[in-house]
Each structure stands twice: as structure tokens, then as C-alpha cells.
């Protein structure tokens, strides 16, 4: 709020609305007079935008913005501004933590000690050292590259796939470019760092899992909708996947009581917390508020990241 007040003036009215699906109609009422909206995961579609005649900008305090209908926003002259750079270090650090924890059966041992009061290292299967394994990174943007830099001293080799980047970036970051099939077939550990777009909805499905010849550890730190969860569960049940880690699921409000991924000793799930640190939280709030200030003040060139043309 200090950033907003300083940039827009003391008369700026700021309202914090605790959104749930049950309060959506009330949310629409509040949108009626809003000039700017700051949110992370609330769905902003054409219907929502139709309830916001004064809205000029949607600032996303997250890197992803697939919750916003860009075409509808652009048609109505509403700018969409995510925060493109605030948690690269944190998410890549989480990737390394997942790799280590899943490879060394930490979840299994923790449950064994906490729930069974059992002290038996040999109860878990033997596992290969990270230094004997190949890491495959799907999505080689800022976070993917940062994960590769951190993993260099841990794994045998790193391969990556990303059709949207300059090919020279693979070599410059010490990794080998691989086709999708090559990566799936050759990797002992696969980390998904892709943003979600029209080309990768349910990207990881039965077809992709069947090509994972090494029965790898699979880690999803991209978006939940990149993975077909039914096919994922089948791959875990049949042993096609050795283990699974995720910071994102199909839904941002998952039914954890009935989710078949919960309770498995080879699955680790965190609540979309890979970005979370004191530094990232500070940067996230400041940058997302600065985006609003710059946009409303007509300083579009200063907006950290504007993803549609307004």
C-alpha cells in the first residue's frame, strides 16, 4: 500500500477483497468502480472484465498469467502486467531440493520414523547417486537456466528442451539441447519449468510418460495444467515413474482429502510455495504495485512486464 500511495497519491482508495468462488458475485460488484486490480490466481475472463468498465490494468503478483483472458483484456483496453522476475533463484533452489529429497527417499524415511517409529535404512530401495544421473529440463527460460547452473556440480549431465529460445543459449549455459523424445528417453530426472500456453496443456500425459525409458523422477514446477493427473497417477501406480514432486496441481484449491497423490511415500507436494522466501515476497509485492503505478501514470515503458498491446 505504501508503494501505491506514494505513486498515486494519498487519496488512492485501496480495498483488499478475500476472494473465493462463493464470493464471485460480490467480487464483480467491487470491480465495477476499480481502476486497477492486483491478483495472483483469480480467473479474469471476459465476464469478469464486463463487470469492470473502469478497469485499466490487471497486475499479476506472479510470473504466470494464464488466469487472465488476454484477448478479452486487450479488446477492452486493459493492460495485463505479471511480475517476470522475482523468484528465479527460489524456484530453481526448490528444484534442487526436490531432486535430492526424492532421490534419497526422504519422504519414505520421514514417514517411517514419525509414524512407525522405525529405524531401518534398508527398508527403502537402493538409489543411484545424483552424480550418476542425467537431468532433463523442459522449459529453458530464466528459471530453467538457473536450475541448470545449480545442478552442474550434482549430476552427470544436463539436457534441455525449449523450442522458443535461441539455440545458442543451451551451450552458453553448459547444457546439451535435446529433442523432446531424446530428453524423455535419456533422463533419470525430469524437471518441468514451462509456462502454460495453448501448446502445452496436458503436455505430460500417458504418451509422454510411456517414452520415459529410465522410469525417472518427475518434478513439476511449472503449471499444474501441464500435467494430466490421471495419467500421472497411472504412471506412478505402474512404476513408470520412480517418484514425483510438485509445487503445483491441477487446481489451486485442490481437494487434498481425496486426492490420490496424497499419502504416497514417493510423492512430495508443496502448496505452490517454491517461490517463497523473505526476499521474493518483498520483491513480489513491490514490483506488482509499481506496475500499477507506472501504468496508471501513463509510464508504460517503466512497467516491468506488459504482456499485451494496449
Regions found by a protein language model. Give the residues of each.
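N-terminal glycine-/charge-rich "phosphate-binding" loop or analogous flexible N-terminal tail
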Residues: 1-34, 159, 168
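Short beta->alpha connector loops at strand-helix junctions that form conserved
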Residues: 18, 61-62, 78-89, 181, ...
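Rossmann-like adenosine-cofactor binding region
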Residues: 45-48, 165-260
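Phosphate-binding beta-alpha-beta segment of Rossmann-like dinucleotide-binding domains, i.e.
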Residues: 76-78, 84-134, 146-149, 153
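Rossmann-like dinucleotide-binding domain for NAD(H)/NADP(H)
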Residues: 80-81, 215-310
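Glycine-rich Rossmann-fold phosphate-binding loop(s) that bind the pyrophosphate
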Residues: 140-141
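NAD(P)-binding Rossmann-fold cofactor-contacting core
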Residues: 153-171
Amino acid at each position: 500500500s505504501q508503494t501505491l500511495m506514494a505513486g498515486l497519491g494519498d487519496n488512492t482508495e485501496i480495498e483488499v477483497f478475500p476472494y473465493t468462488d462463493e464470493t464471485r458475485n460480490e467480487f464483480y460488484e467491487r470491480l465495477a468502480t476499480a481502476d486497477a486490480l492486483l491478483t495472483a490466481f483469480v480467473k479474469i475472463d471476459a465476464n469478469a472484465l464486463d463487470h469492470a468498465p473502469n478497469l485499466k490494468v490487471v497486475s499479476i503478483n506472479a510470473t504466470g498469467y494464464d488466469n487472465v483472458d488476454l484477448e478479452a483484456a486487450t479488446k477492452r483496453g486493459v493492460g495485463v502486467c505479471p511480475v517476470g522476475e522475482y523468484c528465479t533463484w527460489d524456484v530453481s533452489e526448490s528444484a534442487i531440493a526436490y531432486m535430492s529429497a526424492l532421490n534419497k527417499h526422504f519422504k519414505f524415511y520421514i514417514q517411517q520414523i514419525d509414524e512407525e517409529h522405525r529405524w531401518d535404512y534398508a527398508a527403502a530401495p537402493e538409489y543411484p547417486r545424483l552424480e550418476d544421473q542425467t537431468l532433463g529440463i523442459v522449459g529453458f527460460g530464466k528459471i530453467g537456466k538457473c536450475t541448470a547452473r545449480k545442478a552442474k556440480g550434482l549430476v552427470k549431465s544436463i539436457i534441455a528442451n525449449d523450442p522458443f529460445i535461441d539455440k545458442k543459449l543451451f551451450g552458453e549455459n553448459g547444457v546439451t539441447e535435446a529433442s523432446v523424445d531424446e530428453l524423455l528417453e535419456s533422463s533419470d530426472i525430469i524437471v518441468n519449468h514451462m509456462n502454460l500456453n495453448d501448446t502445452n496443456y496436458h503436455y505430460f500425459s500417458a504418451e509422454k510418460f510411456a517414452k520415459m525409458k529410465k522410469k525417472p523422477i518427475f518434478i513439476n514446477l511449472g503449471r499444474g495444467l501441464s500435467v494430466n493427473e490421471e495419467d500421472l497417477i497411472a504412471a506412478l501406480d505402474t512404476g513408470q515413474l520412480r517418484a514425483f514432486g510438485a509445487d503445483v496441481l491441477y487446481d489451486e484449491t485442490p481437494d487434498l482429502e481425496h486426492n490420490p497423490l496424497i499419502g504416497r511415500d514417493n510423492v512430495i507436494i508443496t502448496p505452490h510455495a517454491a517461490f517463497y522466501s523473505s526476499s521474493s515476497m518483498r520483491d513480489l509485492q513491490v514490483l506488482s504495485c509499481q506496475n500499477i503505478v507506472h501504468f496508471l501514470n501513463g509510464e508504460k515503458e517503466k512497467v516491468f512486464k506488459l504482456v499485451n498491446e494496449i
